[in-house]
Amino acid sequence: GLPILLVFSTLSAWLRLEGVSRTEIGFFAWAGMAYTFKFMWSPLVDRLPLPLLDRLLGRRRSWILLAQIIVIGAILLASSATPSTGLFVIALATVMIAFGSATQDIALDAWRIDVAEDEYQALLVAIYQWGYRFGMIAAGAGALVMADFGGFSFAYTVLAALMLIGVAGVFLAPEPARPKALGGGTEAIEGAVKGNPLGEAAAWLYSAVVAPFVDFIVRYRWIALLILTLIGAYRLNDFVLGFMAYPFYVDMGYTLSEIGAVSKVYGVFAMLAGAM
């Protein structure tokens, strides 16, 4: 919940206060497409072991840690620049935050599914939503209030430090059992090309990227297209319209503290009530 607002509303408020045009701010919303299209690299996160980290932490936690390192580094990169003189640096950092955050979402969802039985999934989802929303309060209302008094560079630095809570959680959380290999005949393919490096690479890509989509389409047939369209477009309006709301609040003369209190405290607690 913390990184996503540094890609959307909190970022847009910072840019508008620094005099960046609404047109330029709108282009920053494209960074949020990482959340919509994260399904494209989720099979790699599911199947690809990270060197060294995979042995130390396991598949799920190693990817979570890598994503958090990317996010922390990107937040610190953004804090080192200002929109007036380093807009490209902030744009690059925003893309990195979005990619790292989306990857963290993939790995966290996989960890949650693997670590607990089905009867505990609803409880874990509720806990996940609570943590997600508290992160949004920190990156929304908290960041805006801090920026009101100490500037956005200070606020971003504090938020990067808060990400260390998640890093500590990675080391404290249990690692689920190794994910089971996908079926669908991929084991036979991998066995047939064993010893051929090019064939092994092609078989691995098939089992990691192609096979999950084939299994999904075979299982749901033409409904799969509707499901993928819904998943891809479900939050699209929020990403675009929500991103442009804060610049309008700033133009209307509201202070950052007022925007944070109304938009990112009262609204978030209403969402938390719904999660219960």
What does each of the following model-derived ranges do?
Residues 1-35, 223-248, 252-255, 260:
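Helix-loop boundary and gating motifs at the non-cytosolic
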Residues 34-41, 262-276:
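Transmembrane alpha-helices of Major Facilitator/SLC transporters
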Residues 35-39, 122-147:
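Glycine-rich segments within core transmembrane alpha-helices of 12-TM secondary carriers
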Residues 46-49, 53, 78-80, 137-157, ...:
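Transmembrane alpha-helix termini and helix-breaking/packing motifs in multi-pass membrane transporters
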Residues 50-51, 62-84:
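C-terminal ends and interior cores of transmembrane alpha-helices
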Residues 56-64, 85, 145-162:
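A membrane-interface helix-boundary motif in multi-pass transporters
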Residues 65-72, 154-172:
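Symmetry-related core transmembrane helices of the 12-TM Major Facilitator Superfamily/SLC fold
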Residues 178-226:
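Juxtamembrane intracellular "pre-TM" segments in multi-pass secondary transporters
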